[in-house]
């Protein structure tokens, strides 16, 4: 319906007799002088401000579309009263908010619903007003209900000023029975009419629907937490399903904690603890058990235990080569042989360099990697040490190689390290090419070498075998081309190929600390392409490739398979022979690195010797064991490892050599302070020197620093130092011998032998053995020694004397007396080792 405002003074319906449903228009008029009486304001433009009208039949009124109106849902004022005062009595209220042409439009969309509606259930509202003569509730509650019921008494003649859009304000007086009064706070002065409520006439929602809305709101506000709880619940269900299935086999290291073993076997740790308790072991879930115990425990569940290494436990899955395009790669050739048989000299002749001249003692003490270009292709050579101390280096060289070139001197023949190199090559299942060197020597005998090697399983092709032999002279440059041809021929037969499109993988050949560049690692790339910026894991450390250098020291951007390079950017010093692998992200590399470091610390802690009561009693019975403590510092990791193993081999049951610290780099202040903490620590520097600060500190703290450039010199000197710590052995030394010529009976003393000194000397208080017919009858001490009637200390050969032996009187003529004494003799470590072995066999 449409309400039309004119200049009339009174409100009248167009047709007072019409039904509410037929009412269409109502005219509202106001004279200017009526404004003083509190009637609605009408501005100069004709727009009424705050005009409020109501009719009792709002719910049944028909709505009419206003021409030109833009807001939907607009209704007119129902015709139900003759005056404004009567229209104010009750019913739904509407607010005139805009003007369309000459018509004021009543818009109910701006009114806000009563927030207190729905707080009471329908039954509660009815029961609340059941005894009152007030009209029954129409579905509203709170302020809305009071307003509908007539409001509260206010100042006489004040307009209807309650604004329900502002919420409850409090301070209302009790309701007064009688004609309807406007609701609102107590105050003075005219106030504008209140806006109409949206949803007028609708009953309040019941309490059940209100609780439903609260639950929906709670779920929306706590959506993330509820989703997380749901995920945890699903994961818990999955874990319960997993616990039911015990795998057929698990992989562990040499020792494993009960919790880790239970996790691998999909069991609860408490269950394994109960099993161990039944086996007589009191353990906790974080306590470690050895591999044998874990095997017995797993066998009860039908599970097999496999022992794996540190890197197998944290293996990085790599892309397979099944669907990749493989390309040819250069062969990796390791040169092996006995010391001083000409390995480095042969490589120098091939590369036209002089590396051997710059080596201390003329021997190689670390692995060198070189790339050589030939007319038929490129070859990567690895030069390994031949000294006995570098066994691990030779083993690593055989592991990462494709072909082994065995250098044997024609004059020396097969030596111990030659046999060891053959065993390493056979263990790695790589082909061997024998190069007989020094054929220019006059005493060279190649046939003897071939015969001895054939006995070891390396039969020459000329003799019907499958081993290629090449006679060379590195000094004269003879036969080197034939050696290169043999290598390339063997490589063609092997069809060496690699995947160039995957993440780079390889092996650490050597690692060291370079002044100004930090930690430098020599790497052989086995597959993939290594580029600057790649993240990787080397051993137990992660890093990012900052720079790559080839064997000539030139900076390059990438390294292809079989290429020996040096890389920068490691977080720690990896061990020689550790695996090297590029990862997809730095996060993955760091996670693997932290896990491997944790496993290594755990493994090192397991290797620490713990003192038990049995060991304590045993050490007390043996006496205190001397310890020779050393700190080893070297130029490269491989040399440090070789020196450490060589020195630890010197230990015996009486003297133990203990390496308390070993690392790569110069001798620094920390090393000196560590040695100063114990008075019996020696610092051994191999191809390194102390820093100026460390040298001053060592002199002040009186710490001994030994510097060596050749490994066997260091081993020999440490051996002599340990021999000085051995307790000297007592050795019987024969002083002389005498023959019994006559026996004298002396009262209260016993028998005394009159002897003739045949050789040497007879001494008082010396040891004497009584020998008859080659059998020692008695060994005792010379209690008295007389020459005629005088007591003497010693009698030399050619003289006669009287000899009394302590607690022995059964002398006979022709008996032989041997005089001896015990002397301390310094011992050798080899003798101590032999005595230890004999004691163990006994």
UniProtKB/Swiss-Prot annotation:
Organism: Treponema pallidum (strain Nichols)
Coiled coil: none
Annotated region (G1), positions in chain: 337-344
Name of this chain's protein: Translation initiation factor IF-2
GO molecular function: GTP binding; GTPase activity; translation initiation factor activity
G2 as annotated region, ranges: 362-366
Record-stated family: Belongs to the TRAFAC class translation factor GTPase superfamily. Classic translation factor GTPase family. IF-2 subfamily.
Domain tr-type G: 328-497
InterPro entries: EF-G-like_DII, IF2_II, IF2_N, P-loop_NTPase, Small_GTP-bd, T_Tr_GTP-bd_dom, TF_IF2_bacterial-like, TIF_IF2
Bias type Basic and acidic residues, positions: 32-41, 153-165
Top-level taxonomic group: Bacteria
Gene3D superfamilies linked: P-loop containing nucleotide triphosphate hydrolases, Translation factors, Translation initiation factor IF- 2, domain 3
Chain intervals for the UniProt region annotation (G5): 473-475
GO cellular component, one term: cytosol
């Amino acid at each position: 319906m449409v309400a039309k405002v004119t200049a009339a003074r009174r409100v009248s319906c167009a047709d007072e007799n019409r039904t509410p449903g037929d009412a269409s228009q109502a005219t509202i008029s106001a004279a200017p002088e009526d404004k003083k009486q509190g009637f609605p304001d009408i501005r100069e433009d004709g727009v009424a401000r705050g005009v409020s009208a109501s009719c009792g039949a709002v719910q049944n009124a028909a709505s009419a579309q206003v021409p030109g109106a833009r807001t939907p849902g607009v209704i007119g004022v129902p015709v139900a009263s003759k005056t404004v005062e009567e229209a104010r009595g009750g019913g739904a209220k509407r607010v005139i908010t805009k003007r369309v042409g000459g018509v004021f439009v009543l818009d109910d969309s701006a009114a806000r619903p009563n927030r207190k509606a729905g707080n009471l259930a329908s039954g509660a509202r009815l029961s609340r007003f059941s005894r009152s003569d007030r009209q029954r509730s129409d579905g509203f509650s709170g302020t809305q209900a009071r307003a509908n019921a007539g409001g509260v008494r206010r100042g006489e003649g004040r307009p209807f000023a309650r604004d329900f859009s502002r919420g409850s304000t409090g301070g209302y007086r009790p309701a007064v029975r009688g004609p309807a009064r406007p609701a609102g706070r107590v105050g003075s002065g005219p106030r504008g009419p209140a806006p109409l409520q949206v949803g007028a006439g609708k009953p309040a929602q019941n309490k059940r629907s209100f609780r439903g809305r609260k639950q929906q709101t709670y779920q929306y506000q706590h959506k993330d937490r509820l989703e997380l709880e749901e995920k945890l619940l699903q994961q818990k269900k999955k874990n319960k399903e997993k616990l039911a299935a015990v795998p057929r086999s698990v992989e562990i290291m040499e020792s494993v904690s009960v919790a880790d073993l239970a996790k691998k076997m999909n069991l609860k740790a408490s269950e394994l603890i109960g099993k161990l308790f039944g086996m007589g072991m009191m353990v906790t879930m974080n306590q470690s058990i050895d591999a044998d115990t874990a095997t017995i425990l797993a066998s009860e569940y039908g599970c097999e235990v496999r022992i794996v290494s540190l890197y197998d436990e944290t293996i990085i899955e790599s892309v397979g080569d099944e669907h990749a395009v493989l390309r040819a790669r250069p062969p990796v050739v390791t040169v092996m042989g006995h010391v001083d048989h000409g390995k480095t000299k042969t490589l120098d002749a091939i590369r036209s360099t002089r590396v051997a001249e710059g080596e201390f003692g003329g021997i190689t003490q670390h692995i060198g990697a070189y790339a050589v270009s030939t007319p038929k292709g490129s070859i990567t050579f690895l030069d390994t040490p031949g000294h006995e101390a570098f066994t691990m280096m030779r083993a690593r060289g055989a592991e990462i190689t494709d072909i082994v070139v065995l250098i044997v001197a024609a004059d020396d023949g097969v030596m111990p390290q030659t046999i060891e190199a053959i065993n390493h090559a056979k263990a790695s299942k790589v082909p061997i090419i024998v190069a007989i060197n020094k054929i220019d020597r006059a005493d060279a005998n190649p046939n003897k070498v071939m015969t001895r090697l054939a006995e070891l399983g390396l039969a020459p092709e000329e003799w019907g075998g499958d081993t290629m032999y090449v006679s060379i002279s590195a000094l004269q440059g003879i036969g080197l081309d034939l050696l290169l041809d043999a290598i390339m021929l063997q490589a063609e037969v092997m069809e060496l190929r690699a995947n160039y499109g995957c993440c780079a993988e390889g092996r650490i050949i050597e690692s060291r600390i370079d002044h100004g560049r930090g930690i430098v690692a020599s790497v052989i790339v086995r597959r993939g392409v290594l580029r600057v910026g790649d993240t990787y894991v080397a051993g137990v450390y992660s890093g990012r490739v900052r720079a790559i250098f080839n064997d000539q020291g030139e900076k390059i951007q990438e390294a292809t398979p079989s290429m020996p390079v040096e890389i920068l950017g490691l977080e720690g010093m990896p061990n020689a022979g550790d695996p090297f692998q590029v990862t997809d992200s730095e996060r993955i590399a760091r996670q693997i690195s932290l896990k491997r470091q944790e496993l290594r610390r755990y493994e090192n802690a397991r290797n620490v010797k713990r003192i038990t009561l049995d060991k304590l009693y045993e050490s007390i019975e043996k006496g205190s064991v001397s310890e020779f403590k050393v700190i080893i510092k070297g130029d490269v990791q491989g040399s440090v490892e070789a020196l450490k193993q060589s020195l630890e081999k010197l230990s015996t049951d009486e003297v133990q050599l203990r390496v308390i610290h070993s690392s790569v780099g110069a001798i620094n202040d920390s090393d000196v302070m560590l040695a100063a903490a114990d008075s019996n620590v020696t610092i051994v520097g191999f191809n390194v020197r102390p820093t100026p600060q460390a040298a001053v500190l060592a002199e002040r703290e009186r710490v001994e620093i030994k510097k060596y450039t050749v490994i066997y010199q260091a081993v020999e000197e440490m051996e002599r130092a340990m021999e000085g710590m051995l307790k000297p052995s007592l050795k019987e030394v024969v002083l002389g011998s005498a023959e019994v010529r006559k026996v004298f009976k002396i009262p209260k003393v016993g028998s005394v032998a009159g002897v003739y000194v045949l050789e040497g000397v007879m001494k008082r208080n010396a040891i004497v053995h009584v020998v008859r017919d080659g059998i020692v009858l008695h060994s005792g001490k010379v209690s008295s020694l007389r020459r005629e009637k005088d007591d003497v200390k010693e009698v030399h050969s050619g003289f006669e004397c009287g000899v009394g032996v302590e607690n022995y009187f059964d002398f006979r003529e022709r008996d032989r007396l041997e005089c001896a004494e015990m002397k301390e003799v310094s011992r050798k470590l080899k003798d101590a080792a032999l005595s230890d072995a004999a004691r163990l066999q006994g």
